[in-house]
């Protein structure tokens, strides 16, 4: 994680906006009815959200706009990297699972890391929406929001794409793998 101040320098701010704009223009199919100027205005008005997008970026998420909520006026960003973000892999599901491990503990958990970044784990529906925009996680997998009933029994959900199909799986929440991370969403 970067600095706990949760504010970007003027240079970081400028560079991130430039990068996000470039990605936005390059991937118009993800947001065909959205104009960059409107997104940029929201970002400029919400520096804490820009900080969270920077955290998504530096951990390998390649965030991009995927939707506009007309009711709230918010723009929705998802991690759009082809594979689960590299800086967020080899982690278990949540803090409880991390504490449960007696040895070989991972460095962090998906739930804690996403909270620290100011983002939310994707839900199953959001993950499926993301997969409508391209082929993601064909070599990796990503933890997603898990129902309390499954979590209470020690499990957690993750998803990936194999054989041109999106799959939902379960695993022990304390498990972690080099090819499993998490994807996040952020509303601005």
Per-range role (PLM):
Residues 2-120, 124-188:
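A binding-site-centric feature that preferentially detects glycan-recognition modules on secreted/surface proteins
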